[in-house]
Amino acid sequence: MPEGARRDLAGLRREYTRAGLAEDGADPDPIRQFGRWFEEALRAGLYEPNAMVLATATPDGRPSARTVLLKGFDERGFVFYTNYGGRKSREIEANPRVALLFYWGELERQVRVEGTAGRTSEEESDAYFATRPRGSQLGAWASRQSEPAESREELERRLAELERRFEGRPVPRPPFWGGYRVRPERIEFWQGRENRLHDRLLYAREGPGWRRVRLQP
């Protein structure tokens, strides 16, 4: 039996004591509240505070999840970029209802987002792709995401071919690569508290605005 399977996990716990989340201290707009917490995560020096778990599902309800990087957010939603041929994209195209999760353990916080994903504009995807390091641009061309690979060497050979192909000129965005924007319908802010009586504030879209409610932990 693996060592980890024999380990007693029942005692792995911690007390949350850092802060609280009260209605009178939270912004009535969830995007502004997210921006406030995101800035605090940046100031705290968290490793990749823009990392978020993206959950998708097939039309028949088979879920899958992976970590992607947030590359922008505003009142329209949360943006990430990916290969349009990979599993996550295929599932989004068939079933655009998705969920996001930000976990900032050092701050004893998490943010959950539920909404609908749609592609960003060609212009927006082009503008972001142009900011990527050249190696990442070439990597986007080299990867046939989620398809089987014969070997690591196969990928390295493809990358070398692309380096020769685009030598001395800008790397354009591949037509099979771009962004998605998740338009939020529900955003929940969770703050760990003592005795597991955590603070949970849920914002639900209601007409042109948002309705906020406190949830029991």
UniProtKB/Swiss-Prot annotation:
The kind of enzyme this is, by top-level EC class, is oxidoreductase
Instruction: Give me the residues that bind FMN, please.
Output: 66-71, 81-82, 87-88, 110, 145-146, 190, 200
- Residues involved in substrate binding: 13-16, 71, 128, 132, 136, 196-198
Keywords noted in UniProt: Flavoprotein, FMN, Oxidoreductase, Pyridoxine biosynthesis
Any one of the GO BP annotations: pyridoxine biosynthetic process
Listed EC numbers: 1.4.3.5
Annotated metabolic or biological route of this protein: Cofactor metabolism; pyridoxal 5'-phosphate salvage; pyridoxal 5'-phosphate from pyridoxamine 5'-phosphate: step 1/1; Cofactor metabolism; pyridoxal 5'-phosphate salvage; pyridoxal 5'-phosphate from pyridoxine 5'-phosphate: step 1/1
- Matching Gene3D superfamilies, A to Z? Electron Transport, Fmn-binding Protein, Chain A
The reaction(s) this protein catalyses: pyridoxamine 5'-phosphate + O2 + H2O = pyridoxal 5'-phosphate + H2O2 + NH4(+); pyridoxine 5'-phosphate + O2 = pyridoxal 5'-phosphate + H2O2
Q: What cofactor does its activity depend on?
A: FMN
Q: Does the keyword Flavoprotein apply?
A: yes
What is this protein's function? Catalyzes the oxidation of either pyridoxine 5'-phosphate (PNP) or pyridoxamine 5'-phosphate (PMP) into pyridoxal 5'-phosphate (PLP).
Q: What is this protein called?
A: Pyridoxine/pyridoxamine 5'-phosphate oxidase
